[in-house]
Amino acid sequence: MSLKPGKYRHFKGGEYAVQGVARHSENEELLVVYRPLYGEGGLWVRPLEMFVEQVEHEGELRSRFEFIESLD
């Protein structure tokens, strides 16, 4: 599974820049490397499977993160 780098919106409204997908050194789990486009920033990682999953919010299923645009 792959993920396109770019700007994504979290289902709660925050926007994030996805840098790419990395592999965990111990178990080879795929992790999304991203940073918030607000506040102090910093790099974060989240398992790829969790990043692309559907979540229930206010009674409806939606993507946890939705692609907005490429960052060039």
What does each model-found stretch correspond to?
Residues 1-72:
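Mixed-charge, low-complexity intrinsically disordered regions
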